[in-house]
A protein has these predicted regions:
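Membrane-proximal helix-turn-helix segments that form the acceptor-binding/catalytic region
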Residues: 71-75, 105-127
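A charged, aromatic-enriched C-terminal amphipathic alpha-helix characteristic of glycosyltransferases
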Residues: 322-353
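Acceptor-binding helix/loop patch of EC 2.4 sugar-transfer enzymes
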Residues: 82-115, 155-162, 167-168, 176-179, ...
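Conserved acidic donor-binding segment of nucleotide-sugar-dependent glycosyltransferases
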Residues: 297-308, 316-322
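Nucleotide-sugar-dependent
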Residues: 90, 194, 241-248, 253-278, ...
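Donor nucleotide-sugar binding/catalytic pocket of nucleotide-sugar-dependent glycosyltransferases
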Residues: 123-170
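N-terminal pre-catalytic "stem/leader" segment of glycosyltransferase-like enzymes
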Residues: 1-55, 61, 357-416
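Conserved catalytic-core segment of nucleotide-activated headgroup transferases in glycan assembly
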Residues: 8-32, 151-251, 375-381, 386
Length: 417
């Protein structure tokens, strides 16, 4: 028996969301004393509902198994919390992603149905957990309560970033004043094509005006046609594993985080700023959504409202190496202290404690019904009617469930478990 099971809708084909919203939140909860497991939603078995006190469902679409699982959890007063880090719960949001218009009709139809299935499962849950204020505001239309638990860096991310940062500092000391300045754009998926294209006119001007300027593009993106004239100043790399990402971000002087202004993008998190801050690389980002919430313009990052600001502020950062390093240093100080799992552990643990129904266990010698055991089971029924979740622990026996009328009690045996 463990406290919380994370049911994840993402596998190794989409690793970053699972890492931030499952692995990192498990780290937070475990720091607060909770025990956790995770399972991929297609590997979920109905019997697993017996063995946990609460369930976090991350970006899962509704399936027959999940419908049965959710029904059983509700019967046992076990809370269901839906975690989502993007507005992929209603096609009114995803219709605003231009990249989806490039899909084949059958592919788009399947994508839209998956979004609707996620929305259906969300509506069955008791509450939602999410990453930003903008996302929370939209989710309140679908569930009665929403917790904002921002994305944050794990202990592993900190260790990886610290190792890279030491090497970066040694290199900077050896090289002295930089001769080249590198911009970097790190894309998680092809859906970000429209974001980088938004600042292509700015990049054209900067690359043309500054022969010492280089651009690194990492991710599942093709070089925009308008930038091919500057191919000698541009380096393209494919998708990078998260363990190697700090080194690639540290290799650039300015991290670019443009976002087109849509409700979908306003709900996105500040991950790119945090990841760059941990290796002391300054971030220039669009002044919207989580960036506007978290970044202090000119203090620990740079925010840009329009093309003119992008051009002006990027040129300033290109020209002023001391300013770049000062801003990056302040971002590092703040993010390494405040944007990490241990800093946020208390908040999510206290929320979980407040939203957990009373948990009770009846320890019985066995499930053979006798007068005393019958009285214990009547008390168990009364507790369930009052909203508690009840488990039966036996010293021996093979029973996994005890059924009495409409009541289904999970049975955990010391002999079997």
């Amino acid at each position: 028996y463990r406290d919380i099971l994370f049911i994840s809708g993402c596998n190794e084909q989409l690793p970053h969301p699972h890492r931030y919203r499952v692995v990192h939140q498990m780290e937070q909860l475990e720091a607060g004393g909770y025990t956790c497991d995770t399972v991929y939603f297609q590997e979920l078995k109905p019997w697993m509902v017996r063995c946990y006190g609460a369930f976090v469902i991350f970006r899962c679409p509704m399936t027959d198994t999940l419908r049965e699982f959710a029904t059983m959890a509700k019967q046992m007063n076990k809370p269901l919390w839906y975690d989502v880090d993007d507005l992929v719960i209603d096609t009114k949001y995803t219709d605003q992603i231009p990249f989806l218009d490039r899909m084949q009709p059958e592919e788009r139809q399947a994508y839209d149905q998956n979004v609707r299935n996620m929305g259906e499962l969300l509506s069955l849950c008791d509450a939602a957990v999410t990453t930003t204020a903008a996302l929370a505001e939209e989710l309140k239309q679908y569930v009665p309560e929403v917790l904002i638990n921002r994305n944050c860096a794990s202990d592993e991310m900190l260790l990886l970033s610290e190792a890279v940062l030491k090497e970066k500092q040694k290199k900077n000391e050896a090289d002295g004043t930089a001769k080249k300045v590198r911009l970097g754009y790190f894309s998680g998926s092809a859906t970000h094509l429209d974001d980088i294209e938004m600042i292509v006119p700015v990049l054209k001007q900067l690359l043309g005006k500054n022969p010492n300027l280089e651009l690194l593009i990492v991710g599942i993106l093709e070089l925009p046609v308008e930038l091919k004239l500057f191919a000698s100043q541009i380096q393209m790399e494919g998708f990078v594993d998260y363990q190697k990402l700090p080194e690639r971000i540290a290799s650039v002087d300015i991290n670019l985080a443009p976002l087109t202004d849509t409700i979908f993008n306003r709900a996105k998190s500040e991950n790119k700023w945090v990841e760059a801050a941990l290796v002391q690389t300054v971030t220039a980002a669009s002044n919207l959504g989580a960036f506007a919430e978290m970044v202090q313009d000119g203090e620990d990052g740079v925010l840009c409202r329009d093309e003119a600001e992008w051009l002006e502020k990027l040129q300033w950062l290109i020209d002023d190496e001391p300013a770049r390093k000062a801003i990056a240093g302040r971002a590092y100080g703040r993010c390494s202290r405040e944007c990490v799992t241990i800093f946020h552990a208390t908040g999510i643990c206290e929320w979980v404690e407040r939203h957990w129904n009373l948990r009770c266990a009846f320890v019985l010698p066995a499930m053979e019904i006798s007068g005393g055991i019958r009285v214990a089971l009547l008390h168990a029924e009364m507790l369930v009617k009052a909203g508690a979740q009840v488990s039966l622990f036996t010293l021996e026996g093979e029973a996994e469930w005890y059924h009495e009328g409409d009541f289904h009690f999970p049975v955990l045996s010391a002999e079997r478990e």
